[in-house]
Amino acid sequence: MSRIGNKVITMPAGVELTNNNNVITVKGPKGELTREFNKNIEIKVEGTEITVVRPNDSKEMKTIHGTTRANLNNMVVGVSEGFKKDLEMKGVGYRAQLQGTKLVLSVGKSHQDEVEAPEGITFTVANPTSISVEGINKEVVGQTAAYIRSLRSPEPYKGKGIRYVGEYVRLKEGKTGK
């Protein structure tokens, strides 16, 4: 039994869902998202409530059921509220700045790293050491934030690098002398 799949999704005011042969389009105040779901899963819309129903209890359907519901919920939340990932930089001389839609990072390399914003993603730099990635598609926001973090992930001795706000980086002890 999929506990997540059986939960009902409540659509907030201003969000509208259209189902065209399991190609779901969700429109809201922040934008529009379209995604194709498995043909065997049935998506029912009753007023402001969305339910996801699987045809049988086979192992394949059970695995798809919860995932479909979670993806659909992320679409509804994305077009109504949006998603945001915050990153922080630790290290001497580590800086971030915006040049148009491009994010330019100085992270201790001989060159600067430039990250082009994917479609639907906006970067915000509040101060030179903090970056915000915002958008309506949760997957793209997460992938973009993970890519930025991968350019200089935190090292385990001093913790220098790019990390998520609130991320705990376990520090190792250095070498001990004789």
Curated annotation (Swiss-Prot):
Pfam families: Ribosomal_L6. One of its GO terms (molecular function) is structural constituent of ribosome. The keyword Glycosyltransferase does not apply. Keywords: Ribonucleoprotein, Ribosomal protein, RNA-binding, rRNA-binding. Transmembrane segments: none annotated. Coiled coil: none annotated. GO terms for cellular component: cytosolic large ribosomal subunit. It comes from the Bacteria. Signal peptide: none annotated. The keyword rRNA-binding applies. One of its GO terms (biological process) is cytoplasmic translation. This protein binds to the 23S rRNA, and is important in its secondary structure. It is located near the subunit interface in the base of the L7/L12 stalk, and near the tRNA binding site of the peptidyltransferase center. Part of the 50S ribosomal subunit. NCBIfam families: L6_bact (TIGR03654). Belongs to the universal ribosomal protein uL6 family. This is Large ribosomal subunit protein uL6. The gene is rplF.
